[in-house]
């Protein structure tokens, strides 16, 4: 039989500058090494530098059809362009955090209890991107609260669930209906722009 091709993505000198944070508490590389050792795959460690990201910024906008998450999408586009040289179809780890509760809002108490989208608890950074005229015409907080409450109301309920488990289900549903949709669209558009069929 043939060994499975696997790929991991990292940034040049990440090992030198990595700082633990809520979204990425540890580097990926040690875990990748364990997976490769266990599964005996034909693994390629792909790295991206600043020049690669800059070169792919406009391509990332083209792939998405609108301005996007800048370095996140340009680096993904770069990595997809490398993977497609070996495989035309690939399985990704995209959406694993939504399914398995990998985000900080599944665990941090203030996020878990917040009655708003846990990834948008502070709207100020988003409002800074908008013109003052738009901010006056559009009540972002009200829109977010309404969309949040509508999604909470449609969250499936399980008989006999305690309050904590019911809230965990709500957080999961918010992720599936909102956060994950953004990531799936990004993955689909970025990979297909490179001719790579990515499955989540």
Task: Label every model-predicted segment.
Residues 1-160, 164-168, 183-200:
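ATP-dependent adenylate-handling active sites, centered on carboxylate activation for C-N bond formation
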Residues 173-185:
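PAPS-dependent sulfotransferase catalytic domain
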């Amino acid at each position: 039989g043939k060994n499975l091709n696997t790929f991991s993505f990292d940034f040049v000198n990440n090992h030198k500058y990595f700082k633990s944070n809520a979204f990425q508490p540890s580097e990926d590389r040690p875990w990748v090494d364990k997976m490769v050792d266990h599964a005996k795959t034909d693994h390629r460690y792909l790295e991206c530098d600043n020049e690669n990201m800059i070169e792919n910024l406009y391509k990332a906008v083209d792939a998405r059809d609108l301005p996007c998450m800048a370095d996140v999408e340009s680096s993904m586009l770069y990595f997809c362009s490398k993977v497609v040289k070996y495989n035309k179809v690939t399985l990704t780890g995209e959406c694993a955090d939504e399914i398995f509760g990998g985000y900080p809002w599944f665990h941090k108490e203030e996020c878990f209890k917040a009655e708003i989208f846990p990834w948008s608890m502070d709207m100020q950074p988003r409002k800074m991107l908008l013109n003052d005229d738009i901010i006056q015409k559009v009540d972002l907080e009200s829109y977010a609260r309404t969309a949040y409450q509508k999604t909470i109301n449609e969250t499936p309920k399980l008989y006999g669930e305690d309050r904590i488990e019911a809230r965990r289900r709500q957080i999961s549903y918010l992720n599936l209906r909102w956060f994950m949709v953004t990531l799936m669209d990004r993955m689909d558009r970025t990979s297909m722009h490179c001719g790579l069929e990515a499955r989540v």
